[in-house]
Amino acid sequence: MENKVKKLSLRIDLAGIAGMDEEQKKPDFSQRGIAANIIKNVMNTYAQGRHGLSQADRKKFYNVFDTLDKAVADKQDEVELASEAAGFLRQCFREATLVPNEILRRAEALVDGMRGF
């Protein structure tokens, strides 16, 4: 398997999300932080649903977590993930049992839109 780099955007569109005030809907209001937290919560839900992860999957999990945290701290709108880590992230979104809502839908669109897939 090739180990290409996949690019994941952290610019989540918050327009039209109920329960958010106007300040939070502005493009610069930590959209990357919100997107990163949603992605990390989905990964946690996936891991909990499986009652833990294998060592190989934990390494991918930590890689994605650390990459997202660094991107938020550095105010990056896009992150690069190795194809293995990106595949693991997509698996988390596919297999985790989640309650559908509009903001999750938008986060799923970011993951589905990773360049290179």
Language-model features: locations:
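Positively charged, low-complexity terminal tracts
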Residues: 1-117
